[in-house]
A protein has these predicted regions:
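His/Asp/Glu-enriched, well-ordered alpha-helical/loop segment
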Residues: 1-59
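C-terminal cap of metal-dependent C-N hydrolases
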Residues: 50-102, 106-111
Length: 114
């Protein structure tokens, strides 16, 4: 599905442009979905919660390209779109799965609990 992989970079760009506060972004993409759907142990950095985190560099500038897209569709409506603010590392269940724009381990996800 186009747009999933580009959601965070595009929204971080809005934060850098003053259109969105980082606290609001965290609520929108982390906390609110888990609260809305009643997903347990996700969405917050808290003791006994799953260690699912994304580390971002708010100063990193990137031009989004179709060849960066990992989804099966292989394209993005944001092709050639320049963003400032980019994820540099993703941690799933405490394991680093993406670092410096390279997948280093496939996610070892677990079923969600509601």
């Amino acid at each position: 599905m186009p747009g999933v992989q580009t959601l965070l970079p595009v929204m971080l760009n809005h934060v850098n442009n003053g259109k969105l506060k980082i606290e609001k972004l965290i609520k929108l993409i982390c906390e609110n979905p888990c609260d809305l759907f009643g997903i347990k142990n996700k969405g917050y950095i808290k003791e006994n919660f799953d260690a699912d985190l994304t580390i971002v560099d708010m100063n990193k500038e990137v031009i989004i390209k179709d060849d960066w897209i990992e989804s099966k569709c292989g394209w993005t409506p944001f092709n050639n779109y320049k963003v400032k603010g980019f994820p540099i590392s993703t941690i799933v269940n405490g394991e680093i799965v993406m670092e410096n724009n390279k997948i280093i381990s496939r996610a070892k996800g677990r079923p969600l609990n509601f």
